[in-house]
UniProtKB/Swiss-Prot annotation:
InterPro entries per the UniProt record, alphabetical: CCA_bact (IPR012006), HD/PDEase_dom (IPR003607), HD_domain (IPR006674), NT_sf (IPR043519), PolA_pol_head_dom (IPR002646), PolyA_RNA-bd (IPR032828), tRNA_CCA-adding_enzyme (IPR050124)
Residues the record lists as binding ATP: G8, R11, R91, R137, R140
Keyword Magnesium: yes
Function: Catalyzes the addition and repair of the essential 3'-terminal CCA sequence in tRNAs without using a nucleic acid template. Adds these three nucleotides in the order of C, C, and A to the tRNA nucleotide-73, using CTP and ATP as substrates and producing inorganic pyrophosphate. tRNA 3'-terminal CCA addition is required both for tRNA processing and repair. Also involved in tRNA surveillance by mediating tandem CCA addition to generate a CCACCA at the 3' terminus of unstable tRNAs. While stable tRNAs receive only 3'-terminal CCA, unstable tRNAs are marked with CCACCA and rapidly degraded.
Domain of life where this protein originates: Bacteria
Cofactor note: Magnesium is required for nucleotidyltransferase activity.
Xref: NCBIfam families: PRK10885.1
Gene3D superfamilies: Beta Polymerase, domain 2, cca-adding enzyme, domain 2
Gene transcribed to yield this protein: cca
Full protein name: Multifunctional CCA protein
Catalytic activity: a tRNA precursor + 2 CTP + ATP = a tRNA with a 3' CCA end + 3 diphosphate; a tRNA with a 3' CCA end + 2 CTP + ATP = a tRNA with a 3' CCACCA end + 3 diphosphate
Origin species: Legionella pneumophila (strain Paris)
Binding site for CTP: G8, R11, R91, R137, R140
Amino acid sequence: MKVYLVGGAVRDRLLGIPVQEQDWVVVGATPEELLKRKYRQVGRDFPVFLHPETKEEYALARTERKSAPGYYGFICDFSESVTLEEDLARRDLTINAMAMDEQGNLIDPYQGQRDLEEKLLRHVSPAFAEDPVRVLRVARFASRFHHLGFKIANETRLLMYSMVKQGELAHLIPERVWQEWQKSLQEKNPEQFILSLRSCDALRVVLPEINSLFGVPNPHQYHQEIDTGIHSLMALRASSELSEEPLVRFAALVHDLGKASTPIQDWPKHHGHEEEGTKLIRALCARLRIPNDYRDLAVTVARAHLNIHRVCELRPNTIVKLLEQVDAFRRPQLFHKILIACQADAESCGKTVVYRQTQLWNEILSECVKVTPQTFIVQGYEGKAIKEAMHQSRVACVERIMTSWKSNEK
């Protein structure tokens, strides 16, 4: 029985970046042997075990053979005779197909170290095409390592394109699409996930709602970048500079989703795209089973972003109603996320923007939350009268703030 460190831990060690988790491959052993050594089996489809002390994952070396279309269409062999090289051969990219023995010696049968040095994301073998999830994984690694200068190898991009044309991506299950997309939203360059999928025509299949934004014009006076798809990616890029939260980044990306569904004869104007966008976001989230907190924030940003931008043009009563509608008084942290997504939208319009709306909205909210029910209860207000009195008191707060704000602007 021999044990090897494999995959991402080896890759990240060679890159000199922090190792998040360690995975191990066991060669020349059986499940029974590991169980005798107090390892705990957790793998359902193939034997994966947790170390009795470190709780790190140890998997028996295995091979995979395609037996049917899709993610689950594989026959696995995890017998004692499977070699380390055979196990590494089934992996997606050469940079993920390296191992280290217990003495720290590198085992690199597929030139992963060379591709690390050349900053290339290259598939290990033609077997890459047997698993459609690998297209998504390559796009995710592109988003993770873009800041280090990594590119997808031309031959790998061509293979991904071929997989799309052959219809292999039709077998992707919704959970895996979202799993890879969500992971990419946590990377340094989440926009590269979308760009990588688009470069091999996979975006059209996997995320048609986003793909349809490319080629949709925007009014030039607001968007120097013109194209709605490009603007959406710029908003995603801007949001990743402002926040590490994937919820905010997702909301920034899909805030203009409705623009592709507005009447073509009205372009580049997009009247009503806010409400149209909320429908598309709900449908997208239902299709990919995206969590409700992502959906709810994205829907709110899509619906409210124009009014958030135009705060100085709104009546005080409208401002208070908006804050009530987005539940800002009870959930100010949620409103903060909305503001970040809106700021990302404003900063992605192809010109230098100082988004003072954030300061103004925060000032308004901080004053309005000081209005509490107790003030009116002691005055004898009851039921709906309390709510109405609070609303009017908040409107008065906004009037004072807006008057002061506008006088300072002169």
